[in-house]
């Protein structure tokens, strides 16, 4: 009777017609992974300094192509790719010479963001690694009247909801403070917007 499945023993016939037991030896599995589903081999790390430079420069261009980043942010990315500080600085200087990275442009773009006050911009520029001198120079270009109007516009849109709070003025102050506006901007905005929405009108 045939036996299903793998058998630990096989048989063969002798020259005289008898049956001799033969131990079954399973095939050894290859330690080499199958080609199907096999992971792609990792690319070899560039060996020469020039190859490393070209690879790091290409990575810098990709990083700068995604979004405008500061020198400090780009340096951090490059340092995670290369352990050669001289090579990192060389690549940084190169992308700056070509005009692909400029901290002043990044600061100006951040300063033009609408809906945030001077304090938020200052905090963001510091977090992104810009120097104190550049931050001060950037913030001096802000228009105080424009900042005041932005605070008023934000509060006007939000006032119907804020007016239903237990203390509308305190809620309005917190709302604008979270967006980086200072007290000298917030209080005038609250007074002006509160006059636009009388209590009976705000409740409707």
From Swiss-Prot:
One of its GO terms (cellular component) is cytoplasm. It comes from the Bacteria. Transmembrane segments: none annotated. It is found in: Cytoplasm. InterPro entries: RecX_HTH_3rd (IPR053925), Regulatory_RecX (IPR003783), WH-like_DNA-bd_sf (IPR036388). One of its GO terms (biological process) is regulation of DNA repair. Residues 1-51 are annotated as: Disordered. The keyword Cytoplasm applies. Keywords: Cytoplasm. The keyword Lipoprotein does not apply. Its main location: cytoplasm. Residues 39-51 have a biased composition (Basic and acidic residues). PANTHER family: REGULATORY PROTEIN RECX FAMILY PROTEIN. Modulates RecA activity. Belongs to the RecX family. NCBIfam families: PRK14137.1. This is Regulatory protein RecX.
């Amino acid at each position: 009777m045939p036996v299903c499945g793998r058998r630990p023993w096989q048989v063969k016939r002798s020259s005289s017609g008898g049956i001799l037991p033969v131990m079954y030896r399973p095939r050894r599995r290859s330690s080499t992974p199958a080609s199907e589903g096999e992971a792609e081999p990792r690319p070899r790390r560039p060996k020469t300094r020039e190859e490393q430079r070209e690879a790091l420069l290409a990575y810098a261009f990709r990083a700068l192509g995604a979004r405008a980043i500061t020198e400090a942010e780009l340096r951090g990315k490059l340092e995670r790719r290369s352990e050669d500080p001289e090579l990192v600085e060389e690549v940084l200087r190169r992308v700056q010479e070509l005009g692909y990275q400029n901290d002043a442009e990044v600061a100006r773009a951040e300063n033009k963001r609408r809906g945030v006050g001077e304090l938020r911009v200052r905090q963001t520029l510091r977090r992104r690694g810009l120097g104190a001198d550049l931050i001060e120079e950037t913030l001096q270009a802000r228009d105080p009247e424009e900042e005041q109007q932005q605070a008023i516009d934000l509060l006007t849109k939000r006032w119907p909801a804020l007016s239903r709070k237990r203390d509308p003025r305190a809620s309005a102050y917190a709302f604008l403070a979270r967006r980086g506006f200072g007290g000298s901007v917030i209080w005038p905005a609250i007074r002006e917007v509160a006059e636009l929405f009388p209590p009976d009108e705000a409740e409707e």
